[in-house]
Amino acid sequence: MDSLPDAILQYILSYLTSARDVAACNCVSKRWKESTDSVKSVVFHRNSFESIMETDDSDSIVRKMISSSRRLEELVVYSPFTSSGLASWMMHVSSSLRLLELRMDNLASEEVVVEGPLKLDCIGVAKNLEILKLWGVLMMSPPKWDMFPNLRSLEIVGAKMDDSSLSHALRACPNLSNLLLLACEGVKSISIDLPYLEHCKLDFYGQGNTLLVLTSQRLVSLDVQGCSWIRVPETKFLKNLSISSVTGRVYMVDFNNLSSLEALSIRGVQWCWDAICMILQQARDVKHLFMKVEFTGNEALQPFPEIDFVEFFNNHPKLQTFDIHGAMFAALCQKNSLKKLETGFTIPCLEEVVITVRSPLNAEQKMNTLESLVKYARGLKRMVIRILRMKSNHSSADDFCDDICKFRHMNEHLVHIE
């Protein structure tokens, strides 16, 4: 390395990212120390200062290291820091930073919670940020952010916030194309209007009764968890949609246009039947469908009503992969579900189906439905039958499992049992 020209040495060292590696290079020689000023990205891992007791000391070490860089573009800090330390860092590198990722740890203790919002305020001076990632955020008051005109990606993981604070933060990021909010607690009603947003993942933690209104003409993928009412009026380019609710009910979903939708996933303990019907009706051209909803009903838990097998597949002619769990499969296996079957009926595009069976009840109809899938889906390449938590003490359980095994042997090139 000593025989290399300065320019090549600087070029090689500029690819260092770990703060410990940069610090080690500074100790090699004066020439190496001077060459590390070309480092553009520095990562301080969680254990970077495990031998240092005082956070103020680690703050000063970070400041010295980042201030020695001519143009630091990416700063990632997982180690503990104070708001005053962050403010001093931003004074040195705010104009050049493009990516900032911070483990805020605002939720760790009451003492930190008091100073937490100040950390958010310090970030506001980094006007040229393109990517901002924050972990463990307290946002119970609006952050003092003016505007991030270049910010394209905002990710917040683990947060306590209220509606007005989140709205204020998003207004400071008008040009976002990627928004990720995971495990965010306290949001009850949020309206998001981001004209350039393409990818959005929202995970609201709590009772699962959040109201969401999202407006973006460019939206391509949307993943929502924890919302009971969802309205997205502009979805002309939406290709991937996932809606789930672990704790609450999904009462209403309103999407204006799902003509481009290719993949749809709906999950949850309970969805209102109107919401299920609406989303399935709007997603007529979907190619990949995943359904894991246990019950329907506006208040009390209700089983799925009967679904006509022929109408369902006629309404989704482009379906290629279909993953259905207990309740939906049972709805397709009712007494009259197969009554419209006729010789001209086909399922033209279906290639793979995964079926989760949880009950031996209505076994004969379930076997008829499985046989119909094989018969009418001429292009079927794979069928997976998952037997999950079936109560073996039920009188018909053994017979049903025997029937499934026989069905598998008759179609061993297609059918797999898990």
Swiss-Prot record:
Record InterPro entries: F-box-like_dom_sf, F-box_dom, FBL13/AtMIF1-like, LRR_dom_sf, LRR_FXL15/At3g58940/PEG3-like
Domain called F-box: residue spans: 1-47
Pfam families for the chain: F-box-like, LRR_At5g56370
GO cellular component: plasmodesma
PANTHER family in UniProt: F-BOX/RNI SUPERFAMILY PROTEIN-RELATED, FBD DOMAIN-CONTAINING PROTEIN
Name under which the protein is recorded: F-box protein At1g10780
Organism lineage: Eukaryota, Viridiplantae, Streptophyta, Embryophyta, Tracheophyta
